[in-house]
Curated annotation (Swiss-Prot):
Coiled-coil region: none
Role noted for this protein: This protein binds to 23S rRNA in the presence of protein L20.
Name of encoding gene: rplU
Name this polypeptide is given: Large ribosomal subunit protein bL21
Cellular component GO terms, alphabetical: cytoplasm; ribonucleoprotein complex; ribosome
GO biological process, alphabetically ordered: translation
Source organism superkingdom: Bacteria
Name of a matching Pfam family: Ribosomal_L21p
Length: 106
């Protein structure tokens, strides 16, 4: 069984036992978190699809928090002797999917 969940403004296709990185969540490592905004559920019988499936949820365990590799940004204006360098490291939360519960379409 798999599901498509929404967190941090992004959609993720997940299955039980998978580990993935999502936008930073304010939950301590080792705690469980429940995602209620599920857009799709699928298994061998077919799929359930909707804006938000009523009663559907995905539970996950927070494994760790971290920061991604640095992305370097350079802004350059030709012939003006102007160059601006900047870097960015995005915070993330690593989660492990522990369960997927089905539901009815709203």
């Amino acid at each position: 069984m798999y599901a498509v969940l929404v967190t941090g403004g992004k959609q993720y296709r997940v299955a039980q036992g998978e580990t993935l990185r999502v936008e930073k969540l304010e939950v301590e490592a080792g705690n469980e978190i429940k995602f209620d905004t599920i857009l799709m559920l699928g298994d061998s019988d077919g799929i359930k699809l909707g804006d938000a499936l009523k009663g559907a949820s995905v539970t996950a365990k927070v494994v760790a928090h971290g920061r991604a590799d640095k992305v370097r940004i350079i802004k350059f204006r030709r012939r003006k002797h102007h160059m601006k360098r900047q870097g960015h490291r995005q915070h993330y939360t690593e989660i492990e999917i522990t369960g997927i519960a089905g539901g009815d379409k709203k």
